[in-house]
Regions:
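N-terminal Rossmann-like or analogous alpha/beta NTP/dinucleotide-binding catalytic cores
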Residues: 2, 7-132, 153, 157-159, ...
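Membrane-embedded alpha-helical core segments of multi-pass
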Residues: 129-130, 136-137, 163
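Short helix-capping/linker segments at secondary-structure and domain boundaries
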Residues: 97-101, 136-143, 313-321, 351
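A short coil-to-beta-strand element that immediately follows conserved catalytic motifs
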Residues: 73-75, 138, 243-245
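Conserved nucleotide- and phosphate/pyrophosphate-binding catalytic cores
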Residues: 13, 150, 156-395
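Flexible, glycine/proline-enriched loop segments at strand-loop-helix junctions
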Residues: 109-116, 138-149, 267-269
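Active-site glycine-centered loops adjacent to acidic/histidine catalytic or metal-binding residues
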Residues: 133, 147, 258
Length: 395
């Protein structure tokens, strides 16, 4: 299992409930590798690198304070495992440009970050670097939310293409071409067109149609049927296994202004923020606009505070808050009181655990060094297999 985060600043409750909390559970179920994606931080923040070292160090402290256990999970820094960059380079030789341009987040981030110069190869190629990050450890799965499934899918396509190009049996292509002729001239032409659409454009509908074409053809032997499926999908000897996207429940973490909690919106509560500041932020957090006066009833579903109640409050407290809101039986500040207590309690625990590591920076560096060494051991084995398949081993 593998996942990572970009070190772009202090972590907040959105990061914790969106990923970290899930990681703390997964580490006891799988062999997990969690990395600080400092190369990825450069794709949108290369103009100022003055804080990247400190952000990386502080991110690892946040992880440890949140409950990641270096005794069971491997924590490391991406740039300290050079195999990431080398596999990225090698995979770039076989990745069609169009595959990178059609990743949904490519255009989305260009729109969202118009003030930044994103006309760089690094930004265009970050999904490929992400694929290299994943494939290097040959994980069975990658924990993601719904919005990240496309990133895992392009990783699967790249692995499939690599296995197709470099993992085929001797004379695989010649045997596949002979099998295509056995389809008959009309079906052979259709198959070639569908194969081209899928491999060059990632057309999933073409893949489905090609499967149906092969399944419905009685001229093929079983061996040729399987061979043409491999020729179509780009499979062969599996050097880089295709990882699954493991959809994980990621609860909505609402920011102080009612939007998704995000550093870019300036609406966050930091994992190690001062408790008094946290309480102040929550007391002034937006509520249901219908509650102008204390006696005005409201609707919890229209109140950003309610989303946090669902994360933090026990069922009886949620029922009290919802009923009090709808009937105007309680005011907004009264509603926030038990929530503030719970959030401050959690933040205080994070701060205390983090302080132990702040006071022992050498311990943190040791955890990182040990994790990097272990990660390199696994990564180098994969890279050796990749280079051997590509003919890049020399005496």
């Amino acid at each position: 299992m593998l996942s990572g985060m970009r070190p772009t600043g202090s972590l907040h409750l959105g990061n914790y409930y969106g990923a970290l909390k899930n990681w703390t559970e997964l580490q006891y179920q799988y062999d997990c590798y969690f990395f600080v994606a400092d190369y990825h931080a450069l794709t949108t923040g290369y103009e100022d690198v003055s804080h990247i070292e400190d952000h990386t160090h502080q991110m690892v402290i946040d992880w440890l304070a949140a409950g990641l256990n270096p005794a069971v999970a491997t924590l490391f820094v991406q740039s300290r495992v050079p195999e990431h960059a080398e596999l990225h380079l090698l995979l770039s030789m076989i990745t069609p440009l169009g595959w990178l341009e059609r990743v949904p987040s490519y255009k989305d981030q260009q729109e969202q970050l118009k003030e930044k110069d994103l006309a760089t190869y690094g930004f265009l190629g970050y999904p490929l670097l992400q694929s290299a990050d994943i494939l290097l450890y040959r994980p069975m799965g990658v924990p993601v939310g719904e919005d990240q499934v496309a990133h895992v899918e392009i990783t699967r396509e790249i692995a499939r293409r690599f296995n197709f190009v470099f993992g085929r049996e001797p004379d695989f292509e010649a045997k596949a071409e002979r099998a295509i002729k056995n389809l008959g001239s009309k079906n052979a032409a259709i198959y070639r067109g569908l194969r081209r659409s899928y491999q060059e454009q990632g057309d999933a509908a073409a893949l489905t149609r090609a499967h149906a074409l092969l399944d419905g053809n009685s001229r093929l032997t079983l061996a040729d049927h399987e061979r043409l499926l491999g020729y179509l999908e780009g499979t062969g000897r599996t050097i880089l296994p295709e990882p699954d996207a493991l959809l994980t429940a990621t609860p909505k973490v609402t920011g102080l202004d009612g939007r998704k909690m995000s550093k870019s919106y300036g609406n966050t509560i930091g994992l190690r923020e001062d408790p008094d500041e946290v309480a102040k932020k929550l007391r002034t957090m937006q509520t249901d606009p219908a509650r102008v006066r204390r006696t005005d009833p409201g609707d919890p579903e229209k109140c950003p505070v309610w989303d946090l109640h669902k994360l933090y409050s026990a069922p009886d407290v949620q029922a009290w808050a919802a009923n009090g809101c709808r009937t105007a039986g309680i005011g907004c500040l009264e509603c926030k009181k038990p929530l503030i207590d719970r959030v401050v309690e959690e933040i205080t625990g994070m701060r205390q655990r983090a302080q132990e590591y702040e006071d022992n920076p050498e311990q943190v560096r040791g955890i990182i060094a040990e994790g990097c060494e272990k990660a390199r051991g696994v990564a180098s084995e994969t890279l050796d297999d990749v280079k051997q398949a590509m003919g890049l081993t020399y005496r």
